[in-house]
Curated annotation (Swiss-Prot):
It comes from the Bacteria. Belongs to the bacterial ribosomal protein bL35 family. One of its GO terms (biological process) is translation. GO terms for cellular component: cytosolic large ribosomal subunit. InterPro entries: Ribosomal_bL35, Ribosomal_bL35-like, Ribosomal_bL35_CS, Ribosomal_bL35_sf. GO terms for molecular function: structural constituent of ribosome. The lineage of its organism: Bacteria, Pseudomonadati, Acidobacteriota, Terriglobia, Terriglobales. Keywords: Ribonucleoprotein, Ribosomal protein. This is Large ribosomal subunit protein bL35.
C-alpha cells in the first residue's frame, strides 16, 4: 500500500496533540480589530480543539 500524502493546507492549520486530539487556531483575529474588545481579541489568541465530528477527517489529512 502506498504512503498517504499529507494535505499541505491542513498541515498548516492543524496540529496533533500527544493525546490524539487536534488543535486549531481561532478565527477573527486578522484585521478590523478596532471594533473588537480587548477581551475578545485575547480569547481569539487561545487555541481551540477541532470538534469530535471533524477530527477523523483531519487526522486522515495529517497522517504523520
Amino acid at each position: 500500500m502506498p504512503k498517504l500524502k499529507t494535505h499541505s493546507g491542513a498541515a498548516k492549520r492543524f496540529k496533533k496533540t500527544a493525546t490524539g486530539k487536534v488543535k486549531r487556531s481561532k478565527a477573527f483575529k486578522r484585521h478590523i480589530l478596532t471594533s473588537k474588545s480587548t477581551k475578545k481579541k485575547r480569547h481569539f489568541d487561545m487555541e481551540g480543539l477541532v470538534s469530535k465530528a471533524d477530527t477523523p477527517k483531519i487526522k486522515r489529512m495529517i497522517p504523520y
